[in-house]
């Protein structure tokens, strides 16, 4: 299994436009072969002082993929290219972490 944490920060004033495009893309991603989880998340409220927030303009995709081949196919999917084209000028930063389970 492959895990992905993708942290996206919007340029000022662009948060809602990115979220709209991302939300519209989620069903196509979840339908991909090998997609186990694909969740669009934002900071939880009311979690207390132990939480380190990303901030209002940042959201995180939490993903699980069956294997590296499924993740690579996802990255090359036409709907991902269309999503990237819609949001490329709206994003301030994008950091993608790809990880393997450490508890094997």
Positions of the model-derived regions?
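Generic structural signal for secondary-structure transition and capping sites
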Residues: 27, 34, 70, 92-96
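Glycine-rich beta-strand-turn "strand-cap" elements at beta-sheet edges
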Residues: 39-54, 82-104
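Short amphipathic alpha-helical segments
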Residues: 14-40, 79-83, 87
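Residue-level signal for beta-strand positions within conserved beta-sheet cores that form or flank
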Residues: 2, 34-36, 57, 92
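Amphipathic repeat-derived elements
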Residues: 1-15, 90-101
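Short, well-ordered beta-strand segments in beta-rich or mixed alpha/beta enzyme
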Residues: 2-9, 41-75
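Catalytic cores of transferase enzymes with a strong primary signal for eukaryotic protein kinases
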Residues: 60, 75-77, 98, 102
